[in-house]
A protein has these predicted regions:
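Major-groove DNA-recognition helix of helix-turn-helix-type DNA-binding domains
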Residues: 18-44
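Intrinsic disorder/low-complexity segments
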Residues: 13-16, 44, 59
Length: 60
């Protein structure tokens, strides 16, 4: 699954990858815990931002 996702993720792919719900995904983006950007009303999440988030969480 992880290798099938491109370099830019959608909110749905983020949810599937991290096994989280939509509200949690939006909270992570809005708080800046996962760096992302919006094009219009659509969030775009760089895969590297998700990798960094996972590393920070597993390092604790």
């Amino acid at each position: 699954m992880y290798d099938e996702i491109g370099e830019i993720l959608t909110i749905e792919e983020l949810m599937e990858l991290l096994y989280i719900g939509k509200n949690t995904a939006y909270q992570l983006l809005k708080s800046g815990e996962i760096k992302a950007f919006k094009i219009g009303k659509v969030w775009k999440i760089p895969r590297e931002s998700v990798n960094e988030y996972i590393l920070r969480k597993t390092a604790k």
